[in-house]
């Protein structure tokens, strides 16, 4: 398995992919973990899945330093995990943490105490305690 510096969970989305491209441009080896196989295939083929100014150029420059996958085992072998997921709201405008907690249930066996975990989401302070 190829070594990466950073794993971006939700990495094929409108927040995760541009962040991954920026990190790649700073010579970080980035793995993008996502569940959208269609978007993963586009990224790995050098196709930007959405409009992002300068995105196509960044994606195709030094492509060996970025890889998109739906294989969760890549999370385990990185120093930094950045979680980029949205937080939907209920009809009462309160955060709905259902998907957030579901994601971390899936991730928990693939995280370790030596990793830096960054939550890049619209959750409020104290949500992760």
Segments from the language model and where they lie:
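Short, flexible coil/linker segments at domain boundaries that flank nucleotide/cofactor-interacting
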Residues: 1-2, 112
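Conserved N-terminal Rossmann-fold NAD(P) cofactor-binding segment
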Residues: 3, 29, 35-80, 86-94
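Conserved hydrophobic helix-helix packing surfaces used for dimerization/oligomerization
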Residues: 6-7
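Glycine-rich Rossmann-fold phosphate-binding loop(s) that bind the pyrophosphate
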Residues: 11-12
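N-terminal Rossmann-fold NAD(P) dinucleotide-binding loop
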Residues: 16-17
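Gly/Ala-rich phosphate-binding loop of Rossmann-like dinucleotide-binding domains
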Residues: 20, 24-25
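Rossmann-like NAD(P)(H) cofactor-binding subdomain of soluble oxidoreductases
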Residues: 89-129
């Amino acid at each position: 398995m190829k070594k990466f510096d950073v794993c971006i969970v939700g990495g094929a989305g409108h927040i995760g992919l541009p962040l991954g491209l920026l990190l790649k441009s700073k010579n970080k080896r980035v793995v993008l973990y996502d569940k959208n196989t269609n978007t993963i295939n586009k990224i790995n083929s050098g196709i930007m899945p959405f409009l992002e100014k300068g995105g196509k150029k960044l994606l195709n420059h030094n492509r060996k330093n970025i890889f998109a996958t739906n294989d969760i085992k890549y999370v385990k072998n990185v120093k930094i995990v950045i979680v980029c997921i949205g937080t939907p709201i209920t009809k009462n405008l309160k955060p709905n943490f259902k998907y957030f907690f579901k994601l971390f249930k899936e991730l928990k066996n693939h995280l370790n105490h030596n990793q830096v975990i960054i939550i890049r989401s619209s959750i409020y302070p104290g949500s992760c305690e």
